[in-house]
Design a protein with these regions (language model features):
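N-terminal secretory signal peptides that target proteins for export/translocation
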Residues: 1-11
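N-terminal pro-sequences and low-complexity stem/linker regions of secreted or lumenal proteins
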Residues: 32-556
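Bacterial N-terminal signal peptides
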Residues: 16-27
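A periodicity- and composition-biased signal for non-globular, repetitive helical segments
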Residues: 10, 19-20, 133, 513
């Protein structure tokens, strides 16, 4: 593996070739570049970072048998390149059969009640099974499922079944299901053409809100409660927080943000530290968080509007509310929030620190900025909920349509030549993954922590909270996630094995635009691994890869 450090290099000749290719593509709209962004000093040739942050997928849930797909007749076929490197997958670990979740009696008969002894083993989900149950992905439940690193109690602690289904799909053993390249075809194609990590984790255990905060701040401590009906989390009655042991609180589960008019005001919280948006604003670098459903003035085709805008998904057979407040990274911070969902004053103002929208936008605004050539330096993207992959209300096929449409659009712009797209997820949803990271940040809450025994997650040092003192509630690394980089500068058909986490994203932003400035206040950006090994800035640039949103196949 040729791991290269970030370095500034000349790239005008190569970029010109990419613009020429884009202009020659028939039917592709080509818009102006973003001149203000392009002249910013960066440590790499990357002038634009787009972070597509989807929901609730473990690495093995999507890549258990990569790069080998079953290729069942009638499904989009996937055939890997001959030189595809090996990844740390279920199949490579020889855990598709005789899995420890089958042999551990602690999972009980519930996991096996329909499908015999096979139910505790991993099993393939096909395209007709795209709609699944939402698994238990709470902080404590995930620790219990990983069972001291043995990863053998998933059906017992995180598994849920689909009522009315048959076989393992109807039981808690559904948590052992995985897709292959016949369903998540686009992601497998991106992994073939660009770069992927098989060693990316959440920074702590737990669901969406902790993951969202880690992606922008690397810190879940320093939570302030604005209103709550709940007590600190226990095994019997989980809640969104624990006492941190220093007189404050650490957020460990989902809760709506204080600074959002769409939040459930009975339970809302805010964060007291800094996030990456604060650093970018201080440096006058354009950025934005773009979320499906954020524009409350829009009326959807089904007549819904405001906070309850929704979209019908035939796959999950439901109307799904587009915007979910507890997924909104920046609404937990007074400095980067837009409580009233105020619209930007113009497309030209998108990304600006002086506009009333305060960097919080609808996903449609991102497309408008692309079309206008006003592409922010840093963009965080959240799809409408029906397309964000979250089991229970979304699915991998709706996700693929949204994801591929967005990536195709970015690749058609001249700014593609200086863009990196990161695709990753906020948490694992509790889906089985065989890889258990060694704990590097311990926690000893008497109730919430159960990984190494009652009241214990690891045996080492507690990480620092916002005050600089060691705190509870930040046990990790947590669960393993897909993490892909799509860019002209991504390594080709490459798998990086260096440990990274969600906090590696703000670290990259800091290294590329902010001269290595860190957030401070105990943020994991200091210790998070670098994503440098996913790039090669000295190789010829990668061409864009256009895919069919419906099938994930390459567009000929």
């Amino acid at each position: 593996m040729n791991k290269r450090s970030f370095s500034r290099i000349g790239s005008a000749r190569r970029c010109g070739a990419l613009i020429g290719l884009a202009c020659l593509l028939a039917g592709v709209p080509v818009h102006a570049q973003s001149p203000a962004v392009d002249v910013l000093t960066t440590a790499t040739p990357i002038k634009h970072l787009v972070v597509i942050f989807d929901e609730n997928v473990s690495f093995d849930h999507y890549f258990a048998t990569y790069p080998l797909a079953t290729n069942t007749p009638g499904e989009p076929a996937f055939h890997a390149a001959a030189a595809t490197p090996a990844a740390d997958t279920l199949s490579a670990a020889h855990l598709l059969v005789n899995n420890p979740n089958l042999t551990n009696a602690g999972n009980g008969s519930n996991a096996n009640s329909f499908n015999g002894s096979v139910a505790g083993d991993p099993f393939r989900l096909d395209r007709t099974q795209a709609s699944t149950a939402d698994q238990n992905h709470a902080y404590t439940a995930e620790e219990q499922a990983y069972d001291g690193g043995k990863a053998d109690l998933f059906p017992r602690f995180t598994g849920k079944g689909t009522p009315g289904a048959v076989g393992a799909f109807a039981t808690t053993a559904q948590v052992m299901g995985y897709y292959d390249g016949n369903t998540v075809t686009a992601l497998w194609q991106y992994a073939q053409h660009f770069a992927m990590s098989d060693d990316a984790y959440t920074d702590t255990y737990g669901p969406s809100t902790p993951g969202a905060l880690e992606l922008v701040a690397g810190q879940t401590n320093g939570m302030l409660i604005a209103a709550t009906t709940q007590q600190p989390s226990t095994v019997a009655l989980p809640s969104f927080y624990v006492n941190d042991g220093q007189g404050g609180y650490t957020l460990i589960n989902d809760v709506d943000p204080t600074f959002d008019n769409c939040s459930n005001q009975a339970n809302v919280a805010m964060m007291s530290g800094k996030n990456i948006g604060d650093l970018l604003s201080a440096a006058n670098i354009s950025w934005g968080g773009f979320m499906g459903g954020f524009d409350l003035s829009v009326t959807n085709p089904n007549g819904t509007t405001g906070c309850l805008r929704s979209t019908q998904s035939p796959i999950v057979a439901n109307n799904v509310v587009d915007y979910i407040p507890h997924h909104n990274w920046f609404a937990y911070y007074a400095s980067t929030s837009n409580p009233g969902h105020v619209r930007p004053s113009s497309v030209a103002a998108i990304g600006s620190a002086t506009d009333a929208a305060n960097h919080e936008y609808d996903l449609n605004d991102f497309y408008a900025a692309l079309k206008a050539g006003n592409f922010p330096a840093v963009s965080y993207i959240k799809a409408p909920a029906f397309a964000d992959a979250h089991a229970g209300y979304s699915d991998p096929l709706d996700e693929q349509r949204s994801l591929v449409t967005l990536v195709n659009t970015i690749e058609r712009q001249p700014d593609w030549q200086s863009t990196a797209i990161v695709i990753t997820y906020d948490d694992s949803d509790g889906w089985y993954d065989h890889a258990a990271a060694k704990v590097t940040s311990s926690s000893f809450d008497a109730q919430a922590d159960q990984l190494s025994g009652a009241g214990s997650c690891g045996s080492g040092t507690q990480p620092a909270g916002v005050s600089g003192k060691p705190v509870n509630g930040r046990c990790g690394p947590g669960t393993r996630l897909p993490f892909l980089v799509i860019s002209p500068f991504a390594r080709a058909n490459a798998i990086a094995h260096e440990r990274i986490s969600l906090a590696s994203v703000p670290r990259f932003i800091e290294d590329n635009w902010l001269h290595g400035q860190r957030l401070g206040g105990g943020s994991f950006d200091v210790t998070a691994g670098s994503i440098a090994s996913l790039f090669d800035f000295q190789a010829p640039p990668r061409p864009p890869l256009f895919l069919d949103p419906a099938t994930g196949d390459r567009v000929k």
